[in-house]
């Protein structure tokens, strides 16, 4: 049994409306995600400056993980930073106070698989003497 044309037209219009609503929702989410990523990059810059203030002998800061790879897909992502410093514990304060979840890794004691991830997709944000 075939649906009457009026019913088919109504179903088509409903589907088109749903598709448009879904498209708008996806566009809104993409914009929110892009804004959140921009905020995170600004926060990385702020953290690097704060780390340098706390430890003038800071050797290196590397961003790694999804933010470094530009592969963030969710609004609830973290910032992965690796540091080479003698004052690692003092740098935890600003990391914990961040509005983002920050995973702070000590390059001198990091597990081999973490060092591999950093070597693979790390983005150096600071190096002493450069």
What does each of the following model-derived ranges do?
Residues 1-62, 68-75, 84-130:
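Catalytic core of pol beta-like nucleotidyltransferases
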């Amino acid at each position: 049994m075939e649906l009457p044309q009026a019913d088919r037209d109504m179903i088509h219009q409903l589907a088109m409306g749903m598709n448009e609503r879904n498209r708008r929702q996806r566009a809104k989410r993409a914009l929110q995600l892009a804004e959140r990523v921009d905020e995170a990059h600004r926060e990385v810059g702020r953290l690097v400056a704060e780390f340098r203030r706390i430890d003038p002998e800071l050797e290196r800061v590397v961003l790694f993980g999804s933010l470094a790879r530009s592969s963030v897909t969710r609004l609830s992502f973290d910032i992965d930073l690796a540091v080479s410093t003698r004052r690692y514990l003092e740098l935890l304060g600003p990391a914990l106070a961040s509005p983002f979840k920050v995973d702070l890794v000590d390059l001198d004691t990091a597990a081999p698989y973490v060092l591999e991830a950093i070597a693979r997709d790390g983005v150096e944000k600071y190096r002493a003497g450069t």
